[in-house]
């Protein structure tokens, strides 16, 4: 069961954002391998791989939540890339962050928009949408 969850989680993480999955592994594998495994199994293997939402809707919800936190830039970076990889547009993601200004505050929305600007520039440099 655990190996199945891990494999499913890694597949989901790599399908959403291959570079982000590698960054997560590099950041945690040596310093906190148990946390890394829990993130892969639970977040990606159990939750993000569920059939109830299509990947685009799931990523919009995730970007909304991470924007609202206001302090989850590494996770938001991953999910901005993932959202774009599954078909969200830059305009849609920008609108999501603007909506969060009402509910999470302008500073949280600004933090997300500043990060989105970086992510968009990185993707432009790579020729990605």
Task: For every predicted segment, state its role.
Residues 59, 106-107:
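Substrate/cofactor-recognition hotspot
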Residues 37-40, 70-76:
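Short acidic alpha-helix initiation/capping motifs at coil-to-helix transition points
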Residues 72-94, 109-119:
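Extended intrinsically disordered, low-complexity coil regions enriched in Ser, Thr, Gly, Ala
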Residues 54, 70-71, 93, 105:
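Short coil/turn motifs at helix boundaries and re-entrant loops, enriched in small/polar
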Residues 67-68, 86, 99-106:
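A short structural micro-motif
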Residues 1-56, 110-129:
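Acidic, glycine/proline-rich low-complexity segments that act as flexible tails and inter-domain linkers
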Residues 12, 43, 78-79, 95-96:
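A general alpha-helix detector
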